[in-house]
Amino acid sequence: MENLIPVVNKLQDVFATLGRKEDQIQLPQIVVVGSQSAGKSSVLENLVGRDFLPRGTGIVTRRPLILQLNHVALDDESKRRRSNGTLLTDDWAMFEHTGSKVFTDFDAVRKEIEDETDRVTGVNKGISLLPISLKIYSHRVVSLSLVDLPGITKIPVGDQPVNIEEQIREMILLYISNPSSIILAVTPANQDFATSEPIKLAREVDAGGQRTLAVLTKLDLMDQGTDAMDVLMGKVIPVKLGIIGVVNRSQQNILDNKLIVDAVKDEQSFMQKKYPTLASRNGTPYLAKRLNMLLMHHIRNCLPALKARVSIMNAQCQSDLVAFGEPVEDKNRTLLQIITRFATAYTSTIEGTARNIETTELCGGARICYIFHDTFGRSLESVNPLENLTQLDILTAIRNATGPRPALFVPEVSFELLVKRQIQRLEEPSLRCVELVHEEMQRMVQHCGFTTQQEMIRFPRLYDKINEVVSGVLKERLKPTNELVENLVAIELAYINTKHPEFTEANLVTLLKEELLLDDRHGRSRNRHASTGERAVSAHGEQQLQPVPGVNGVDLNAVLQQQQQQSQNQRASNGFLGLFGNAAASSKTSPQEKQSANFLPEVPETQLGRKLTSREQRDVAIIERLIRNYFIIVRKNIQDSVPKAIMALLVNFVRDNLQSELVRQLYKPDEMDDLLAETEDMAQRRRDTLETMKALQQASVIISEVRETQVW
């Protein structure tokens, strides 16, 4: 299992070359978290056995420091010999950003960390998420992989932003949220452990404490008469992986250049004297061994998931590269292939034979079918055959068709006049159907499959041109399609076929029978009234020969004659003139009326409101029924013929001629360079994906080198 940590270190090197957070795999590592001046740097230096970290007041660590500790035995010449043949006899360090440069002076390591930090964050106290990667090779260290983060602070200093506390907190959470990480929460012993900020942050992402280890620093600086026994034993706040106490070098020790080896010896003496029962489970040596063991077991547990993650990312990169396509070499062949693929995908979308069927919405041919049989059908059904046609309109049309002669039957001309006006109303929804199909065929350009969409992104200028060609072809076909649809309505208007089988047999015969039946009933009624009137007049005639005594000297015969005269005048007023009102009913004519020609009133343009006679009601009912039934026949014809016209002149024509039109307009040698020019973003994405894929392949090789016997 000792080989597991070097494996992770190699993986960190591989993925560090990518430099992009989204491409990183969450590797097992130890994340060091603590407040400012909590002693984090001292703990790390004690683990390494060297002074190499920047020191000072305020925030010293301003970028994440990925620290890889590699144990190299003094007699391991294979690892200590450099490529130039020199043999390294002591500890050395290497930075990722300096390449193969070797640092044997650890003061120079400190200076390089400071310079690299200032290069990115500035000379004041700004922070950055961009990590610094440092490898240290020594016979004194155990193999570890750690991340040192900026200390938690409350008040901004220098050119730090006012939200510096929030920025540092977000950075810490970003690293400790990695489920493959171990959290090393550093807290000074001379502060209340119950209010430890690192422990609080760790609880947010690791509530069960499965991957949190606490370190209690500055045990030698506690107040006289107090100790950290209860804290170290977990009685104050229990920490599942344990709480380990350490003693750091004081600032005076550092100024006096006290060696870390001597400081570790003094730490052991302090532990034996102050905490004899806990000495074996505290101190820097125990912390290093404990971290090494925890990290190895953690890597062992994470390795299967790590293998799976690398495989998944590798497959995704391969898929992305296929989508991005190979760099264009033969532009003639590439252009023809793209045109052919697009035309095939467009045709498949119309016919419903595409491999990737849309499941969230109707598109292509299915949407055209929906327009024909649902949208267009409902639109025609919503047209009322008698809408905007009143009884007065019908009656006026009947009378205008008869001219000066009263009609015995309903004139056919009035029916044709009225039904044509209603048929004309079918033209608007028919043209709207053409428009909807045209819009859908334009929209289908965006629904031609994943491959086509990727090529749209890769060659935006080419697909702008393809869109223009498709729009042009559709626009060309729109005019003849509209003309044919208008002609279909005009054909129905040109000839009203009253001999249509559905119209003649079902309607005219029935209406004729009803009209004859009504005439027969009215005739018998008139005969009965006439016979009764004759008998009354005969009896009255015999009686009027005799003088009739009056009342108060009034002759009743004279009164009857006067009433008869008034009755005749009233009947005259209900004749032809009565149709225009009762202006002629009065027996006296005013001087103004005598000034008009023939002493007749002005004829109004429309009839005044009155109750229709039974004959008029019958005529109106006949016309309404004829219009309704014939309109339904025409509506069926239009509902059937308009979709056929659209399919013939628009849909099928575009489907059959699109590819040849694309080749004719786009296959031009002088324009190929412009059409097949990739966006810079697409080229960069291909390069990034190739780099990621190369790193993943290296990672896969590294992981495959770990034998199962080593892991378990």
From Swiss-Prot:
Highest rank taxon of the organism:
Eukaryota
What is a single molecular function from GO for this protein?
lipid binding
G2 motif as annotated region, ranges? 60-62
Q: Which Gene3D superfamilies match?
A: Dynamin, middle domain, P-loop containing nucleotide triphosphate hydrolases
Describe activity control.
GTPase activity is increased by binding to phospholipid membranes.
- Domain named GED is located at 620-711
**Cystine pairs:** none
Annotated spans, G5 motif: 247-250
One of the GO BP terms on file: endocytosis
What's the effect of swapping residue 118 to A? Loss of ced-3-mediated cleavage. Normal mitochondrial fission
- Output this protein's name: Dynamin-1-like protein drp-1
Q: Which gene encodes it?
A: drp-1
Q: Could you tell me where this protein is found in the cell?
A: Mitochondrion; Mitochondrion outer membrane; Cytoplasm, Cytosol
Region annotated Interaction with caspase ced-9, chain positions: 280-502
Task: Specify where the region named G4 motif lies, as residue ranges.
Answer: 217-220
Q: Where is this region: Disordered?
A: 523-542
Listed under catalytic activity are:
GTP + H2O = GDP + phosphate + H(+)
Classification via PANTHER family: DYNAMIN, DYNAMIN RELATED PROTEIN 1, ISOFORM A
